[in-house]
From Swiss-Prot:
One of its GO terms (molecular function) is structural constituent of ribosome. This is Small ribosomal subunit protein uS7. Belongs to the universal ribosomal protein uS7 family. One of its GO terms (biological process) is translation. It comes from the Archaea. The keyword Ribonucleoprotein applies. Keywords: Ribonucleoprotein, Ribosomal protein, RNA-binding, rRNA-binding. The gene is rps7.
Amino acid sequence: MSFKLFDKWDVTEVTVEDMGLQNYVCLDEIVVPHTMGRHVKRQFAKSKVSIVERLMNKIMRTERNSGKKNKAYSIVEDALEIINNKTKQNPVQVLVKAVENTAPREETTRIKYGGIGYQIAVDIAPQRRVDLSLGFITKGAMQSAFKNKKSAAQCLADEILLASDEDSRSFAVQKKEEKERVARSAH
């Protein structure tokens, strides 16, 4: 028996093309993306949580949406519906493509030699790449929805569509490029 996400979209046909992210973008067949936090007690267990639920959890991070899972659920469901209507593609595939396109590969970290701090470029772990990508997407969507006539779902759908096309108007793509540019300058 095959389950469809929100009883609408089949996740078995979704592919992750970035080899580094394949083990960290979970595409399990579930109807309702809500694990009730079962993963929080085990390290790295969040990589086994559906990418759609992780997107919902990132939406709940802001102080205005803290703990409002039903609100995040409806925002994500409506955004996926808007993406499906605009592109006629599986919206989960569009989301995965957006995550791949906005996941930075390098960042800087601070080290101290002899009391002097230096910034050095380091590669980012795949788990952190997915986390940063989802954070950039949701932050861009929520910032554009604030004091705007467009709904949060519409802004999230727009951000995901722009990010999946690697459009420079996307907040997430801008943040990724900024992070990688800073890392390149630290070489």
